[in-house]
């Protein structure tokens, strides 16, 4: 069921719940008042029912991709086949049609909505957030919500992908998001949140707490301790089902501390 969240943004939840996806992937549907067309952010996985529900909403000229993970990108070819949409992302592997790669600071006008692209690497190297406002407003203002994808979740904290994610980049991205002030958070998983400034500050504090715990663990376990050893020492407050994910974030913390 398509659920309105703001004047411009509605969410269609994919039925792919899990440890990493929470209730499932949030596919965001952006449409200005009176517009027949819509912009999709993250079509989700290759799920025929989900893609069918999206395609049935109406004309979709443009799909934007927040980052490379399959739970956000797997449905690209299916939605293009159904709608003929142009697909834009940072990575060239996800481009479809003639739109070209997305760039930091770029502004897009489509479906009666103004969308500003913001590079927020860390979770992955290609992670983006999208500021959403209405057409005709002056640049830099009027964006009432931010689609944060997996950089800020609706519940819990984000894993740093050890393939190409970076804690240093992630902390800088959180600081950039914090600087946007009190805007609505429309995440890639979990419920929407009311205050980006507050939640990004909490994320930064959480990361600093974990870094201090890792520093303490290294003093006890030795400087050569593995990420798994540190997880077993530090993450005693976390369900063991999440330890594999915690190991990725801990490896990112070790890489950060070891330079």
Predicted segments — roles?
Residues 45-89:
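Active-site metal-binding motif and surrounding structural segment of the metallo-beta-lactamase
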Residues 15-16, 43-45, 68, 92, ...:
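Active-site metal-binding loops of divalent metal-dependent hydrolases
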Residues 8, 30, 42, 67, ...:
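Divalent metal-coordination and catalytic microenvironments
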Residues 87-100:
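Glycine/small-residue-rich loop that forms an oxyanion/phosphate-binding "nest" at active or ligand-binding sites
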Residues 38, 63, 114, 119, ...:
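Hydrophobic "anchor" residues on beta-strands that sit immediately upstream
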Residues 138, 167-221:
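Divalent-metal (often Zn2+) His-rich catalytic cores of metallo-beta-lactamase-fold enzymes
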Residues 217-259:
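C-terminal regulatory/interaction regions
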Residues 2-56, 129-149:
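Conserved beta-strand hairpin/beta-sheet module of binuclear metal-dependent hydrolase folds
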